[in-house]
Swiss-Prot record:
Any one Gene Ontology BP term: translation
Protein name: Large ribosomal subunit protein bL9
GO CC, any one term: cytosolic large ribosomal subunit
GO MF entries: rRNA binding; structural constituent of ribosome
Cell division recorded as keyword: no
InterPro entries assigned: Ribosomal_bL9, Ribosomal_bL9/RNase_H1_N, Ribosomal_bL9_bac/chp, Ribosomal_bL9_C, Ribosomal_bL9_C_sf, Ribosomal_bL9_N, Ribosomal_bL9_N_sf
Annotated family: Belongs to the bacterial ribosomal protein bL9 family.
NCBIfam families tied to this protein: L9 (TIGR00158)
Length: 147
């Protein structure tokens, strides 16, 4: 029997795939638990429609992320922090601080999206990576000045 998986099923396939399984397995396990649908014409059309809709949403999301990446790359944040004589900061600037500054600038960025190897502890220019999608990131310039 051909079925369309609604969820990922270990050993069978991923959600959205059309697979062949034994009739009993489909009737007694997959269908009652809501893991699959019978692959009839109606359900296949619905699946195609959902795939197209998902692809359009992914494309729009990618375009939005690319425009945000472009704006972030052009942006240079200036952060004022207290520093000692040797240009060392009292405290440090973390991903959370950068995320808050970006939110004040109008960017909805979570601190988990900011890739910073270690907190910034010195005055000067620094470059931070902001991960927007799994394969798209932007370089953000941060200028730390002493108060």
């Amino acid at each position: 029997m051909k079925v369309i998986l609604k969820e990922d099923v270990h050993g069978l396939g991923r959600a959205g795939q059309t697979i062949n399984v034994k009739d009993g397995y489909a009737r007694n396990y997959l269908l009652p638990r809501g893991l699959a649908l019978i692959a009839d014409e109606k359900n296949l059309k619905v699946l195609e429609y959902q795939k197209k809709k998902f692809e359009e949403q992914a494309k729009k999301k990618r375009q939005d992320a690319e425009s945000i990446a472009e704006r972030l790359s052009a942006l240079e944040l200036t952060i004022k922090a207290k520093a000692g004589e040797d240009q060392k900061l009292f405290g440090s600037i973390t991903a959370k601080d950068i995320a808050e500054l970006l939110q004040k600038e109008g960017f909805l960025v979570d601190k988990k999206q900011i890739n910073i190897s270690e907190p910034i502890k010195r005055v000067g220019e620094h470059e931070v990576e902001v991960k927007l999608l799994s394969n798209l990131s932007a370089k953000l310039k941060i200028n730390v000045v002493a108060e």
